[in-house]
C-alpha cells in the first residue's frame, strides 16, 4: 500500500474515533445503556490504532527534524554520524508502525470475537483414535484455562476403552474464535498405543471442528423440524443416578443432525445446551456454503477451516509436532501441555501476510 493511502485511511479511522468520543459525551446516549455500550466497544477497538497513528505522525516529524539538522551540520562529522544513527533508528520505528497499522486496517472476520463449540471426533484408528480425541480435548482445555477462558464439555460419547468417540466442548471468552479457528481439521498421531504389545507405531486420527456460537436471530430453527427424545442420565449422584430422564436426544430432521446432551443436571439445561450445539452446527453449514466461492479464490489461505483438511501430525517417537500448513515443526510435549501460542501465532502471522498481499493488490 502506498504510504499516502495508509495515512489517508488512518486519518479516517482517527476521525471516526473522535466522533465516537463526542457521542460518548452526549447525555442522550448516556441514558441509553445498550447504545452506550456499543459505542464504547467501537471506541475501544479503534483506540490502539489511533495511538499508533499518532506515534507514526510524531516519528515522521522527528525524521524531518533530523534531516534538517543534518543539513545544518554537514561540516561536523561527529554530529553527522550521530544524526545518521538516529535516522536509522527512527526509520526502523516508522517501518514497525507502518506494519502494525497496516495489519490493524485489514478486514476483520466478524466472527473472531465469538465463543465457540469445539467438536472433536475420533477418526481412523479404533480405540486408539478415541484415546487420541481425549488427549486433544485435554490439550485445548489446558490452553483455554491458561488464557482464562471457560472450558466445559457439553456433550460426550465415551469409548469403552477410554477416551471419546465424540466430544463437544463449550469454550467461552474474549476472541476465542480468532485463536481456535486455525485448529479445525484432521489431527494425526503417530505413537505406540498402550495396548500394543509388539511396540509397533500406529497412526490414528481425530477431527476437530471449530464452530462459532450463533445467536437465535442468525439461525432460525422451526420447532416442527425437531424431534426431541429423553433418556436417563447419570446425574449428580445418590438417588438421582439413572432414575431421572435428564438427557436430551435432539434430531434436526431437515439435516439429519443429532445432538445428545447429558452433561447438565436438568432436562431443561440439557435441552438449552443441545440447542446451542445445534445452532452452532447449522451456522457452520451456512458459513461453509457462504464461503465456498471465497475459499476457491484464496488457495493460499492458512487452512480452509474444513474438518477434512489434514493440518497437523504429532509424532511421539521424535517428540515432534508438524503443522502441514506452515511447513514447520514444533516440540511435542509443550503443545500437548496446552502451549499452543507459538503455532497459533504463526498461523495468524501467515494469514495476515496473505491478507496484506490481497489488500495491496486491491488498493494498487
UniProtKB/Swiss-Prot annotation:
Methylated by PrmC. Methylation increases the termination efficiency of RF1. Keywords: Cytoplasm, Methylation, Protein biosynthesis. One of its GO terms (cellular component) is cytoplasm. It holds the Pfam family RF-1. It comes from the Bacteria. It is found in: Cytoplasm. Its main location: cytoplasm. One of its GO terms (molecular function) is translation release factor activity, codon specific. The modification N5-methylglutamine is found at residue 239. Peptide chain release factor 1 directs the termination of translation in response to the peptide chain termination codons UAG and UAA. Belongs to the prokaryotic/mitochondrial release factor family. This is Peptide chain release factor 1. The gene is prfA.
